C-alpha cells in the first residue's frame, strides 16, 4: 500500500521521452520545504461509492550530514489501521538523503512489509560516475535522476506558472533497478475540497506505471496547494477494484504560510 501511496502522490508510467528545453527536474532549487516539516495523509479505499479509511502515510524531513555533505533526510512511513491488518497488514518505510543545494538524491532505502511480502532495498547514487549501486549490482543512470521520495519533494519546487494547461514536464526516476523516463501533465488551477478543507490548488495528471494496482494512462488526478509550499492535498485514482483517495489531514512546520487554504472542513 505504501508504495501505492508514493506512486499516487507522484506516479509514473514507463514511457520514453525526449527532454524538453528548460526541464525543471535539472534546474530547481529548494524554496518549498524546510527541515522539520511533517505531512500526514489518510488513505481511503472505495467500493460501490463507499469510502473507508485503510491507513496513513507520514512524511518527515530533517537536516543531516551524509558523506560530509548537508542533506535533507526525508522519511515516509506508511501503515494500515489495526482493523485492516487482518485483511492486509502494511508496515512500510521509505527514506531518501537529498542534497540541500541540488535536491538530487545520494541514497534511497526501501523497507516494506505488505501482506506477508517483505523487501529491503538500498540504493546509493554516485554523482561522479552517474551510477546507482543497489543490492543487485551497479546501474547507469542519467545525471538528473530521482528516486520515489526525492521526486515528490523536487516536484514541489516546480514553477507551474510558466506552464500552460496541457504541457508535459518530463523527468527520470530510478526504481527497482530500472530507469524510467516519465512526465506529468499540467492541467491548470482550481478549487478543491478535501477532508482537511477547501484549497486553491494546482492540478495535474501523472501517467501511471503499468503493472501497479492503478490503471494505466492519465486516470489519476493530483492537487497540490497553490502557494509556495506546493504540498499535495488530494490524490484520486481508479484502481483494479474500486478507487483510492489520499487526503492531507495534518501538517507541521511548513516553510511558508498555507495561504491556499480557503476554509477548514
Predicted features by range, described:
Residues 4-13:
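Sec-dependent N-terminal signal peptides
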Residues 15-17:
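Leucine-biased recognition of intrinsically disordered, low-complexity hydrophobic segments
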Residues 19-125, 163-265:
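Acidic, serine/threonine-rich low-complexity disordered tracts
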Residues 117-158:
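Hydrophobic, well-structured mid-protein blocks that either form specific transmembrane helices
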